[in-house]
Amino acid sequence: MKKPDFKELKKLIRAISDADAACKNMYAEGDLQREQIRQLCGQIAARQAKDKLDGYSVEELKKSKAGIRVSALISAGYNTLGDIAAASDGEIRSIEGIGDKQIEAIRRIVTEFANSLSQGETVKLQREDTGLITALFRYMKCEKVRKDAGVASKGLSEQATRIAGDPFIRNGVHWLFSGSELKQHTLEMADFIYTFTESEFFGNVLGFFDLYQEGKTCSSDEAIRAFEKNGADFYALLESLGSIKGNRPFVYDSIPMMLAEEIDGLDLDLSGFTGNLRAYQVFGAKYILNQKDVLLGDEMGLGKTVQAIAAMAHISARAEGICHFLVVCPASVLVNWGREIEKFSNIRTFTLHGAGIEDSFDRWKQQGGAAITNYESMGKIVDGIDNRMKLNMLIIDEAHYIKNPDAQRTRYIRRLDNESERILLMTGTPLENRVEEMCNLLDFVRPDMTSQIRSVAHISNLPEFKQKLAPVYLRRTRSQVLTELPPISEKEEWCSMTADDTAAYIAAIGTKSFQTMRRVSFLQEDLTESAKGRRLLELCDEAVAEGRKAVVYSFYRETIARVHKLLGKRCSGVISGDVAAEERQGIIDAFSDAKEGSVLLCQVQAGGVGLNIQAASMVIFCEPQIKPSLTWQALSRVYRMGQVRNVTVYHLLCPDTIDEDMILRLEEKQISFDSFANESVVAGAYDDIMDREWINDLIKKQNEKYLPTVL
């Protein structure tokens, strides 16, 4: 038998051992990262509490009964505890009647008061909190690696332990005194080590370490950019770590305590869910699962879709066989639903709409997963479900679409009642004061409760009414569940093109004009037949229902003009390059004074610089911008100090068009932008991502897709 190369084997064994140690260290460092975050949160909470001292009178010192001459402090100009905290010992000592003992007592009392405030303080992140934001972002990155590497880590540990426990493979001396059986064992073990260290599995493990190191060392600029793009993820992480407290009374709202405890006691399985949930979202998912047939009415922007996906992920994880979910939604959000499900879960998606609907239906029925269809397509699939298959959950988005019990689409959906183990209706429209509409919806999910609701309808603002609704209707508002500084959330609204959109887009491709193609879905005069136009109207309707104002941005004057015509009187003003700079503030002032639901139209470059538009809390972009700075300059007009509402940003996009390519291009180049967060010449060089070569390639690609016969 040929003797193994024990020197080489020792190197490989050391590599395996080092990898195993690094893996264990990777998980151990999670505790250190969490502790660092808690300490940084404590510092910020203390700072915030200290800032609040200005709101408390120096008279608070009297309550300590420490004999402090409060009147002398007031006479010297110290009116608040904040004034005292900011003063030096020498400044306080100069006040007549205040000696060292009183200074010591004052410092102790003010410190204790500040500490008590910080205990209940909600950490409110600001861009300047670079240390905490960076620590959170690094933790997110590292935790994802730890989660993804879980199975590999266990496998590596088992093999490392096995190798470490074999004395014969480590020492050539054993070979000299071993019989043929032990030598054969040693050769087999050596062969295993060579194979293992060259395997794809071991390579993947080493790849995890590279990703982990990247996460540990990512820059503060990258972290700040991520925070500005989606602060909600940072707050969700803070909440999950216990560094900020969810507003529990409003998570449950008026749900009776016994029911709330029953719901909260449900063990939510998120093993198949990829993302972070806020406390109120966890409760919402549990509510959906525990109550089975419900109406989720959370205010727009609180993540009803994510809660529904979390519930689906739980059902899928606990099921023994395949699951069937059916989502019915407006056509304008079909693509969005598919992308969200794929983003936050491992559930297969099937779009039941348009050409190929029968084939997609058959594959969904056979393979399981989530089918997504629009109201208009229900007639084509209902016969295939009714009395033929079971649905683990039926989800009706924008449920007010079926408020009319006599409408054909309502009758189609009601036929699936007996086939659905769970039914979830979703709407962001407040229904408490629309009792008849609510009863029509409740009659679908809980017909036994309709008469009870109607019996107390005349006291719709009293606790009895809410308690009657509690088992079937859950609604939370932003002001109730998001107590921190308002986060900004961005959503991609993928709108499937209409026939008019497609025809106009094909004509634009024929011109080979990049600028014309960018106006996809806004090229035709009549935007009522535009997919983006329809979705824009829906979003503006939601703004009216929620009592919010919206800013609509486009790079193009023609688009602004056509959207103005579409919106009509709800548009309070237009800011474009044609409007003189001195007139723009007057338009902003008029918008600020306008009624809720009003819309301001802005050309990106005209309305993106030098204006404060805090009156708006909804921002809609009609197309992707060629420079990230254009987008963020526009957003900064709304999302800035003084904004008291959560800001929701919608990007209107059409799949299989120039929009999709531009979004991908932006994502590919994001790392370059993260390196140059500040405005500078260098930032500008990285900012202009749409170079001529890329544009030419894109036009060629679109031409081949839509005009394959045109040379």
Model-derived regions, located:
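Charged, low-complexity
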Residues: K24-K50, Q119-T122, A135-V294, G321, ...
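Conserved SF1/SF2 helicase motif Ia
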Residues: L295-L302, Q307-R339, E419-R422, G547
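Conserved P-loop NTPase motor "coupling/switch" region that bridges the ATPase
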Residues: A311, A317, I322-H324, R339, ...
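Conserved helix/coil segment N-terminal to the catalytic DExD/H
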Residues: A317, G356-M393, N404, R414-R415
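Conserved helicase ATPase core of P-loop NTP-dependent helicases/translocases
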Residues: D359-D362, K549-Y553, A561-R562, L566-G607
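Interdomain linker/hinge connecting the two RecA-like lobes of the SF2 helicase core
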Residues: V435, C439, D448-S451, A457-R548, ...
